[in-house]
Amino acid sequence: MATLQQQKIRIRLQAFDRRLLDTSCEKIVDTANRTNATAIGPIPLPTKRKIYCVLRSPHVDKDSREHFETRTHRRIIDIYQPSSKTIDALMKLDLPSGVDIEVKL
């Protein structure tokens, strides 16, 4: 038996600000649902933490250090059975500049 492979769009989002990321995910899911496509997600992925250690003093004191950290929050949204209306609506969607988007067909 031959099974038909479903069409799927996978959208991967990254941002430093979690609230920006969540609002972007809501916009994408609402847009997909309005065009009669099935949206699954947002699926949260593990948060990446990058810690930087910096010396406080410009001279000798090696004991005095300061730590800074960046957190990268990530989400995945799968859209099944997309139509041409779905793709056009997603292309016209205006998302904040702090959100990194990667789309795979």
Curated annotation (Swiss-Prot):
Superkingdom of this protein's organism: Bacteria
Residues in coiled coil: none
This protein's UniProt keywords: Ribonucleoprotein, Ribosomal protein
A Pfam family matched in the record: Ribosomal_S10
GO MF entries: structural constituent of ribosome; tRNA binding
Disulfide bridge partners, by residue number: none
InterPro entries in UniProt: Ribosomal_uS10 (IPR001848), Ribosomal_uS10_CS (IPR018268), Ribosomal_uS10_dom (IPR027486), Ribosomal_uS10_dom_sf (IPR036838)
GO cellular component terms, A-Z: ribonucleoprotein complex; ribosome
GO BP term, example: translation
UniProt subunit comment: Part of the 30S ribosomal subunit.
Cross-referenced PANTHER family: 30S RIBOSOMAL PROTEIN S10 FAMILY MEMBER
NCBIfam families named among the record's database cross-references: PRK00596.1 (NF001861), rpsJ_bact (TIGR01049)
Protein name (database record): Small ribosomal subunit protein uS10
Species this protein is from: Nostoc sp. (strain PCC 7120 / SAG 25.82 / UTEX 2576)
Encoding gene (name): rpsJ
